[in-house]
Amino acid sequence: MFCIQCEQTIRTPAGNGCSYSQGMCGKLAATSDLQDLLIYMLQGVSVYAVKAREQGIIDAEIDSFVPKAFFSTLTNVNFDDERIMAYAQQAAKYRTQLKASYEAACEQAGIVAEQVPQVAQLVLGTSKVEMLAQAPIALLNKDKHNVHEDIMGLRLLCLYGLKGAAAYMEHARVLGQTDADVAGRFHEIMSFLGEPSVDGDKLFTTAMDIGQLNYRIMAMLDAGETQAFGHPEPTVVNTKSVKGKAILVSGHDMKDLELILEQTVGKGINVFTHGEMLPALAYPAFKKYPHLVGNYGSAWQNQQQEFANFPGAVVMTSNCIIDPNVGSYSDRIFTRSIVGWPGVVHIEGDDFSAVIDKALVLEGFIYDEIPHTITIGFARNALMAAAPAVVENVKSGAIKHFFLVGGCDGDKADRSYFTELAKSTPKDSLILTLGCGKYKFNKLEFGDINGIPRLLDVGQCNDAYSAIQLAIALAEVFECNINELPLSLVLSWFEQKAIVVLLTLLSLGVKNMRTGPTPPAFLTANLAKILEEKFGLRNTTTVEADLKTMLNVA
């Protein structure tokens, strides 16, 4: 086992990364090894997808499968060995299919089929024992003694960034948004990473390419969500419990929420969002469901307590899931799509009757709590609608600075930095937030500036796209570039979606960002120095010191 993809990975003087019997996330060594083998098989599929494209062969089904299966290897997504093995076996079938199509096309064209690298040649074992025996060939640091640590760090930066992009591709696909050119570029990068490179410049360029690719993917996802559900609008949301039977929907998948809402109409069941599903309450399409009553709980790391206390059924539509046995709710939590946990019921297809039946036999909330409301829904259209008022307030001096504070949440104590930062921002500044990092401060009162709320909840982590659009619009109005705006970006990271959002911002030329609370363990000190020199990217320090720098206070 070797896994170093998330913020909570083991860090020791002897080396970084989870490499024992179990990762810090609870992932067993066998699960980690099977995930590595799955990635290896997917890279082999991409090798042939690239070759097939050269002969004019595009398979949309395979284009969708590879990022979806890749998504299953993200932090806190799939811990079910059987499901991971099934993905690997399907990858082997697709690779064989593409190989045959490619070779047939070459024969028809009168050309010789090209040799493929080792990553596209592995004959996958048929049992778990055989697959685990093959896993060393796919170990991410298998050649660590032969390559410089900076090269290893760049490889992992690319791999983990592409994982994040794959997740957004799958979210977009569910909403009907696919793009053959995007899929083709994705396969090219997967294929490249399947042949471990020692070219630092090429790897760095690839990391930026992944960022550019993800910008296109975020635009696709934005289009998918807004076309399906309308543009989010400022919305007041209750965060307390409501009497009645209950279902809690966590993850990121708006389509699953819609299916659950449709199937619970008239059933006497209240539906709550959780975590990154909170932004759903701002979409017009969901407001026709009076039984979508609010948001329950906070970010992913608190779920073992929050789900244990929730008196209904829980659905995990995507990341992040952690051990449901700790809170003794494994019999009433359901996984969906790429999510998996051994022994937990997995919902296939679009029928959520098992979830509904479970909710109906559970007690539900026995009384209404006194409501506590927050305001959400400041995504792209709402931000653009507010832009003229924002510009006038900037010109008048009422608004002097913008902060984007968001990203992933986590359970480390030093993440209190983000709470204190938000609380310490000047009263003449606006705070944009997104991702589950918002839960560090989104229930606090920040007031407004001439009717403009000081705290603007942009949405999910992928809604960084909306914040980028606002920054571009403001830069155009003030005839400057983004880096000349009075704008400070402070990103909390935990896993691979945050990594690819960071790469996206860097690829767009955004500079002087801060990330925290700790730097990725796979980034060497030398790589961190290069990123600081090239982009001004640095780690958070103290709220007082960082604010002075961001506000240019001597």
From Swiss-Prot:
Main location class: cytoplasm
Entry superkingdom: Bacteria
GO cellular component: cytoplasm
Names of the cofactor(s): [2Fe-2S] cluster; hybrid [4Fe-2O-2S] cluster
Subcellular location: Cytoplasm
Record's keyword annotation contains Iron: yes
Modified residues annotated as Cysteine persulfide in this record: C408
Catalytic reactions of this protein: A + NH4(+) + H2O = hydroxylamine + AH2 + H(+)
Binding site for hybrid [4Fe-2O-2S] cluster: H252, E276, C320, C408, C436, C461, E495, K497
UniProt-listed Enzyme Commission number(s): 1.7.99.1
Keywords: 2Fe-2S, Cytoplasm, Iron, Iron-sulfur, Metal-binding, Oxidoreductase
Cofactor binding: number and manner: Binds 1 [2Fe-2S] cluster.
GO biological processes: response to hydrogen peroxide
Pfam family for this entry, one: Prismane
Family: Belongs to the HCP family.
Known role: Catalyzes the reduction of hydroxylamine to form NH(3) and H(2)O.
NCBIfam families xref list: hybrid_clust (TIGR01703), PRK05290.1 (NF003658)
Protein name listed in UniProt: Hydroxylamine reductase
